């Protein structure tokens, strides 16, 4: 018999301490990694439930195991809410991650060696959009597009020219470090011109899409993938959506997720996804996403006033890239210095970066997490000021310590979990 009095602290104090330290780190640090966010206690409750004990290979009402009647309810709820949230008529909530979701789409619609056209990792794309170190670049013939050096925006004429030249079987729209608005309709027109599938990876902007603050790719893409964390603020996981109405594609996608890419689904995570989707359907979720945009723009305005270069000249979503080439400071060094000031960012390559991906010349900065803990424009501007102060005085530990103290004071006023 398992006693409910069992706890980690008594049994495994070393691990318990690590968990406690990470919990405190999240409270005491300003989180600006664009792909991170904070789950609600409701999501955490679902993810820590007894649903983790259940094996449920297959799909609701078509399982290979018995005893699935209640996890079927949870998965049905997640599917229904995902479709309601995004306007899709197909949803697969089983992918363990965004990369798994993308892998499943590739396997469903392509054969090994087929040509795909996606955004270059160096210009803001994702590993799974054709990077040579990923399955997407190893298994498939990957052709890459980038952004215009002058505007920092996607040049759709260049994308079209590449599509006409290489005749890809699938074109990928989406990004992991691009601050503009993507024209999904233009992507679909290009895909139709060459007879390609259009896959949109909206992992970074799914929350904004759900709130109606960023163009919804569902009316244009054959298939859409996303993560369920980031701007959606749910558990870590993946999601595949479609509104193309093609049942043959839906069947291929389901078979590609299970048994093609995964075995049993994570029932506790699916339940947590269902909770997160319900949260995203509430009116206050749109207000949150509106503030995410306002905070990102507020930070950009301060940094531009301080003489910093922003890739593409600004932001229209939750993130932006800080280009440090003119400062002759590496992203790695800036990341480390800010970390000592309790400000968490991630080093990131900028277009035509002369430095390696392990060093970089830029930082990627996002506003979802600080907004989640209650920051408004005033606090966002203060954070941007601190970032500039630290980078401008990157070897001055007195400045870094001063900023750290001020960060701790602000974090104390805006706890993540009150």
Swiss-Prot record:
GO CC annotations on file: cytosol
Associated pathway: One-carbon metabolism; tetrahydrofolate interconversion; Amino-acid biosynthesis; glycine biosynthesis; glycine from L-serine: step 1/1
Subcellular location as annotated: Cytoplasm
Residue positions where N6-(pyridoxal phosphate)lysine is found in the record: 230
PROSITE patterns, sorted: SHMT (PS00096)
EC code(s) of this entry: 2.1.2.1
Annotated TM spans: none
SUPFAM superfamilies cross-referenced by the UniProt entry: PLP-dependent transferases
Swiss-Prot/TrEMBL site (Plays an important role in substrate specificity) positions: 229
GO molecular function terms listed in the Swiss-Prot or TrEMBL record: glycine hydroxymethyltransferase activity; pyridoxal phosphate binding
CDD domains in the record: SHMT
Catalytic reaction annotation: (6R)-5,10-methylene-5,6,7,8-tetrahydrofolate + glycine + H2O = (6S)-5,6,7,8-tetrahydrofolate + L-serine
Keyword Mitochondrion set for record: no
Gene3D superfamilies referenced in this protein's UniProt entry, alphabetically: Aspartate Aminotransferase, domain 1, Type I PLP-dependent aspartate aminotransferase-like (Major domain)
Keywords: Amino-acid biosynthesis, Cytoplasm, One-carbon metabolism, Pyridoxal phosphate, Transferase
Pfam families: SHMT
Main location (coarse class): cytoplasm
Binding residue positions for (6S)-5,6,7,8-tetrahydrofolate: 121, 125-127, 356-358
GO biological process: glycine biosynthetic process from serine; tetrahydrofolate interconversion
HAMAP family xref list: SHMT
Function: Catalyzes the reversible interconversion of serine and glycine with tetrahydrofolate (THF) serving as the one-carbon carrier. This reaction serves as the major source of one-carbon groups required for the biosynthesis of purines, thymidylate, methionine, and other important biomolecules. Also exhibits THF-independent aldolase activity toward beta-hydroxyamino acids, producing glycine and aldehydes, via a retro-aldol mechanism.
Complex formation: Homodimer.
Protein name according to UniProt: Serine hydroxymethyltransferase
Lineage: Bacteria, Pseudomonadati, Pseudomonadota, Gammaproteobacteria, Alteromonadales
Gene of this entry: glyA
């Amino acid at each position: 018999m398992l006693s409910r009095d069992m706890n980690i602290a008594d049994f495994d104090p070393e691990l318990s301490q690590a968990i406690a330290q990470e919990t405190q780190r999240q409270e005491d640090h300003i989180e600006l990694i664009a792909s991170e966010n904070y789950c609600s206690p409701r999501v955490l409750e679902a993810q820590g439930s007894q649903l983790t004990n259940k094996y449920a290979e297959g799909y609701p009402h078509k399982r290979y195991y018995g005893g699935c009647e209640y996890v079927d309810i949870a998965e049905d709820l997640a599917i229904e809410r995902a479709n309601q949230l995004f306007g899709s008529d197909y949803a697969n909530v089983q992918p363990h991650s965004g990369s798994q979701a993308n892998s499943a789409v590739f396997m469903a619609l392509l054969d090994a060696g087929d040509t795909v056209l996606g955004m270059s990792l160096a210009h803001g794309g994702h590993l799974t959009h054709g990077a040579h170190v990923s399955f997407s670049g190893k298994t498939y013939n990957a052709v890459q597009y980038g952004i215009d050096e002058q505007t920092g925006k996607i040049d759709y004429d260049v994308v079209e020219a590449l599509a006409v030249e290489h005749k890809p079987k699938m074109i990928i729209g989406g990004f992991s470090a691009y601050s503009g608005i993507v024209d999904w309709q233009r992507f679909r027109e290009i895909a139709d011109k060459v007879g390609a599938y259009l896959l949109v990876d909206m992992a970074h902007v799914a929350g904004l899409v759900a709130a109606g603050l960023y163009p919804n790719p569902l009316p244009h893409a054959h298939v859409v993938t996303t993560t369920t964390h980031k701007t959606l603020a749910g558990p870590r996981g993946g999601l595949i959506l479609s509104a193309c109405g093609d049942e043959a594609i839906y069947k291929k996608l389901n078979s590609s997720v299970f048994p093609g890419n995964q075995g049993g689904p994570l029932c506790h995570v699916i339940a947590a996804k269902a909770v997160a989707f319900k949260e995203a359907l509430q009116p206050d979720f749109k207000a949150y996403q509106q503030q995410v945009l306002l905070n990102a723009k507020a930070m950009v305005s301060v940094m531009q006033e301080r003489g910093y270069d922003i890739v593409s000249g600004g932001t229209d979503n939750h993130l932006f890239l800080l280009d440090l080439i003119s400062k002759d400071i590496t992203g790695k060094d800036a990341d480390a210095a800010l970390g000592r000031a309790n400000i968490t960012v991630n080093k990131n390559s900028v277009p035509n970066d002369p430095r390696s991906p392990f060093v970089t010349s830029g930082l990627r900065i996002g506003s979802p997490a600080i907004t989640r803990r209650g920051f408004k424009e005033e606090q966002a501007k203060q954070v941007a000021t601190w970032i500039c102060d630290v980078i401008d005085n990157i070897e001055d530990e007195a400045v870094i310590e001063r900023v750290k103290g001020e960060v701790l004071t602000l974090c104390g006023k805006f706890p993540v979990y009150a």
